[in-house]
Amino acid sequence: MLRIAIAKGRLMDSLINYLDVIEYTTLSETLKNRERQLLLSVDNIECILVKGSDVPIYVEQGMADIGIVGSDILDERQYNVNNLLNMPFGACHFAVAAKPETTNYRKIATSYVHTAETYFKSKGIDVELIKLNGSVELACVVDMVDGIVDIVQTGTTLKANGLVEKQHISDINARLITNKAAYFKKSQLIEQFIRSLEVSIANA
């Protein structure tokens, strides 16, 4: 049995779409037909559905052998896991966004403090970072901050709130991570699962 931690929300939707494309029907249908279950079983796989930021923790602690998580989570802090493969779905990017007329930044709201701090330091810009846990666009709309650093996929949310993308920071994609011990103890099962996703180890 292989236990896989999967990030709920947008990334899981991207995973399901990808599974449909490669016709991995059993796993796709199991994820689609979940109700409120957080633990699902199919074939020789057990899926645990958790918040994105918790995926590497479950893997690190040995509660999951494999994790599928956005690279944004892995960029924010170090985890003792094997950061194994790029996955061909879940593409988006970090960006600085603000009102169209904004040209200078003193305060920035973000859920991704490390990414924002690294970016502005690299540009030699001294900003005050305010950490928020969601709806960072609102902080800019009500003028609490001059701009935000957030994940952008289509830009629809920015546009709906009267904001525009100012600078592209870095690309984000889904990553496959493994528990370090499980990578050796369950190498055959892990490699079999990777093959079933039609992903090559060359994508590391």
Curated annotation (Swiss-Prot):
Signal peptide: none annotated. GO terms for cellular component: cytoplasm. Its EC number is 2.4.2.17. Keywords: Amino-acid biosynthesis, ATP-binding, Cytoplasm, Glycosyltransferase, Histidine biosynthesis, Nucleotide-binding, Transferase. Pathway: Amino-acid biosynthesis; L-histidine biosynthesis; L-histidine from 5-phospho-alpha-D-ribose 1-diphosphate: step 1/9. It catalyses: 1-(5-phospho-beta-D-ribosyl)-ATP + diphosphate = 5-phospho-alpha-D-ribose 1-diphosphate + ATP. It is found in: Cytoplasm. It comes from the Bacteria. NCBIfam families: hisG (TIGR00070). Heteromultimer composed of HisG and HisZ subunits. Belongs to the ATP phosphoribosyltransferase family. Short subfamily. Lacks the C-terminal regulatory region which is replaced by HisZ. Catalyzes the condensation of ATP and 5-phosphoribose 1-diphosphate to form N'-(5'-phosphoribosyl)-ATP (PR-ATP). Has a crucial role in the pathway because the rate of histidine biosynthesis seems to be controlled primarily by regulation of HisG enzymatic activity. This is ATP phosphoribosyltransferase. It comes from Staphylococcus aureus (strain NCTC 8325 / PS 47). The lineage of its organism: Bacteria, Bacillati, Bacillota, Bacilli, Bacillales.
